[in-house]
UniProtKB/Swiss-Prot annotation:
This is Ribosomal RNA small subunit methyltransferase H. The keyword Cytoplasm applies. The keyword rRNA processing applies. Its EC number is 2.1.1.199. It is found in: Cytoplasm. It is an enzyme of class 2 (transferase). Belongs to the methyltransferase superfamily. RsmH family. GO terms for cellular component: cytoplasm. S-adenosyl-L-methionine binds at residues 32-34, 51, 78, 99, 106.
């Protein structure tokens, strides 16, 4: 079944989980590209997966139906999936993958409102939720807009952009992504490779879907699950996400948690739950980037949980 979305770092994901048996959790099922390839590669693997996009779930159910009872799919926020699994399900988990990105289909579909060319202003991953990008743009204070542009878009002119948006919406409600992009400006500035509109849209999307909160909650739920002999791979697409993953994995590998200025260890020096398998983030090859330019910002980090 042909997927409308190209899975990033697919070969690298297959390498990371080669020879895996037991249960595999795909926290971001999407259109089933990673999961389908892993099930095909690893014949003794069972899949538990989730997504919150109804369209993606329905597509993946059909795509993966030939794997029969090896597949179980939930509609859920990825941060909640591990919490709802039974003890029996968790004890056999040997791999976890989360691809923290927007699918190509979501970006390209006009009605989803993710693109700067969209006629809508939506950006919801889960369309059952009421809160959308239009609510952020038309109801947030100027200060709050500036804060999310600065924090999530890392825009140096966040205050100026927020002021432009508030001035525009005072004349009339902003209802489309195209309109918002024209207000912000789509030209590249200060030598940056992307326009302020792209970065601002990223910030709005992160806010609408609480993406960083979701990622933090997912990582905490993984640690709290007391897993053993389990590989965890996280694919992220911008520096804020990658920083969270990098720092979390570093903390998981830290045996001593005494203060840096402590003269001697008093914590027992046994707090590490595993080891980092990727000293540097894995990135897409030039061949993959040529075939799928959206993969250029993807970074994957892998951690092996040994348990304590």
């Amino acid at each position: 079944m042909q997927s409308p979305h190209i899975s990033v770092l697919l070969d690298e994901v297959l390498d990371a989980f080669h020879g895996l048996s037991g249960t595999f959790i795909d926290c971001t099922l999407g259109y089933g590209g990673h999961s389908g390839a892993l099930l095909e590669q690893n014949k003794n693997l069972r899949l538990i997966a989730c997504d919150k996009d109804d369209e993606a779930i329905e597509f993946s159910k059909k795509r993966l139906e030939n794997f029969g009872d090896r597949v179980k799919i939930y509609k859920s926020d990825f941060s909640q999936l591990i919490k709802v699994l039974s003890t029996d399900e968790l004890k056999n988990v040997r791999g976890i993958l989360a691809d923290i990105g927007v699918s190509s289909l979501q970006l390209d579909k006009n009605e989803r409102g993710f693109s700067i060319n969209s006629d809508t202003l939506d950006m919801r991953m889960d369309r059952a939720c009421e809160f959308s990008a239009a609510d952020v743009i038309n109801s947030y204070s100027q200060q709050n807009l500036a804060e999310i542009f600065s924090k999530y878009g890392e825009l140096s002119n966040a205050k100026a952009l927020a002021a432009k948006i508030v001035s525009a919406r005072n004349l009339k409600k902003i209802t489309s992504a195209k309109e918002l992009a024209s207000i912000i400006g789509t030209g590249r500035v200060n030598g940056r490779s992307v326009s302020p509109a792209i970065l601002a849209f990223q910030a709005i999307r992160v806010e609408v879907n609480d993406e960083l909160g979701e990622l933090n909650r997912l990582l905490e739920s993984i640690k709290s699950a007391n897993l053993k002999e389990c590989k965890v791979a996280i694919i992220s697409f911008h520096s804020l996400e990658d920083r969270i993953v990098k720092n979390t994995f570093k903390s998981w590998a830290q045996s001593c948690i005494c203060p840096p200025n402590a003269m001697r260890c008093k914590c027992g020096n046994d707090h590490a739950i595993g080891k980092i398998l990727t000293k540097k983030a894995i990135v897409a090859s030039q061949k993959e980037i040529a075939a799928n330019p959206r993969s250029s910002s993807a970074k994957m980090r892998v951690f092996e949980i040994k348990g304590r």
